[in-house]
UniProtKB/Swiss-Prot annotation:
Pfam families: Ogg-HhH. This is 8-oxoguanine DNA glycosylase/AP lyase. It comes from Saccharolobus solfataricus (strain ATCC 35092 / DSM 1617 / JCM 11322 / P2). Belongs to the type-2 OGG1 family. SMART domains: ENDO3c (SM00478). SUPFAM superfamilies: DNA-glycosylase. The record marks 207 as: Important for guanine/8-oxoguanine distinction. The keyword Hydrolase applies.
Amino acid sequence: MLRSLVQNPKVRARVLERVDEFRLNNLSNEEVWFRELTLCLLTANSSFISAYQALNCLGQKIYYANEEEIRNILKSCKYRFYNLKAKYIIMAREKVYGRLKEEIKPLADEDQQLARERLLNIKGIGMKEASHFLRNVGYFDLAIIDRHIIDFMRRIGAIGETNVKQLSKSLYISFENILKSIASNLNMSVGILDLFIWYKETNTIVK
């Protein structure tokens, strides 16, 4: 089922094009890295489309606007959690902006799990968000376990009924290991497998 999708030339080309974009992000500057982090903050408990639209509404203001201005922009864009996420964006900016790439890239180059642990110190960033961020800046050895991935794993019989909102760290790692095994059987990294599963579940590769 998944193998045939992986072998589909058109889908594979689209996935690999997205992978190349992530690899380019790895070489990009601090602004790009913080933009990707902001996207992951916005994606938590929201759809990717809603988060991406909110990020585009904010534009360059993620780098300098105050909390009230960010909150008002998010609200005007009809983003649901405008109060909380405005606060998280400001907190992240104060905590890591200007040194995010400098601190995370050397860690991720050596140990992606260690880099993920460091990112968990940012308010609003959990296992999924940290994994998502690292994948989007060119690291592919971590799984991004959201409801679409959970649904896929449940449907193929890899896991039982699971509430994605109550996913503990240990269970996340357990599911990640299952996905890594599937990825290994398909001769790819788990972060790239994610894009194929996402396409299968949503018919898009925008994640």
